Design a protein with these regions (language model features):
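Short beta-strand->loop micro-motif that forms the acidic, two-metal-ion catalytic signature
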Residues: 126-129
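Short helix-loop-helix/strand-helix junction enriched in hydrophobic and basic residues
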Residues: 106-114
Length: 202
């Protein structure tokens, strides 16, 4: 049988992505916490299918069942490669943004793509913080980046551009800034510097 290796599109793909991310054994409860947008029963059925196909190993100790990726399976290298797509995407974003003038003082992916809870209809959210008050110099770059990101991922990208002072002024009025501080995936700059910018502590 051909194993199902589509990341983040099916229960099977989500399970494989989680298992490929660490050489560890996972209980159903742990997988459920890592994949909160999937039902427990759906994850249970996916594990049963993947064990039957041989791509996932099941270990039983008393009443506890744990699961791990069968890394000797011929499909395992491809699954691991798919699981690393987020890291590669962030690296490509960073390389692109480092070529801008001026560079963002902070950039981060946020929303479902940062939390690992994307669905087939999700888009990708990115915040870019400009060092100056006038962000117009970035307009062409932002449009080009949105197009490139969709080519890289097949997903539309929503880009939130804010000036440094605008972030400071809006920190108490924009809940999205707190969401980014909590769940964001930094591309340029550090999360601690962003938290300080919005008046938090880290």
């Amino acid at each position: 049988m051909t194993p199902r290796a589509e990341p983040a599109l099916t229960h099977d793909g989500d399970v494989l992505t989680a298992l490929a991310g660490a050489e560890d054994r996972f209980t159903l409860s742990r997988l459920e916490s890592l994949i909160p947008h999937r039902s427990r029963e759906g994850l249970r059925q996916a594990l049963r299918r993947l064990v039957d196909e041989g791509i996932v190993d099941r270990q039983v100790a008393g009443t506890t069942h744990t699961y791990s990726l069968n890394r000797q399976h011929l499909a395992a290298p491809s699954i691991i490669e798919l699981a690393s797509l987020q890291t590669r995407f962030v690296e490509r974003l960073r390389e692109t943004l480092q070529g801008w003038s001026p560079q963002p003082i902070f950039a981060a992916v946020f929303g479902s793509s940062a939390r690992g809870t994307m669905t087939p209809t999700s888009d990708i959210d990115l915040i870019l913080i400009h060092p100056d008050s006038d962000t117009s110099a970035w307009e062409a770059d932002v449009d080009a980046l949105a197009l490139s990101a969709q080519r890289w991922t097949g997903r539309p990208m929503n880009i939130l551009v804010m000036a440094r002072e605008e972030v400071r002024d809006a920190r108490h009025e924009e809940p999205v800034l707190q969401d980014i501080a909590r769940d964001g995936l930094p591309v340029l700059g550090t999360m601690s510097s962003f938290v300080r910018l919005i008046g938090g502590r880290r």
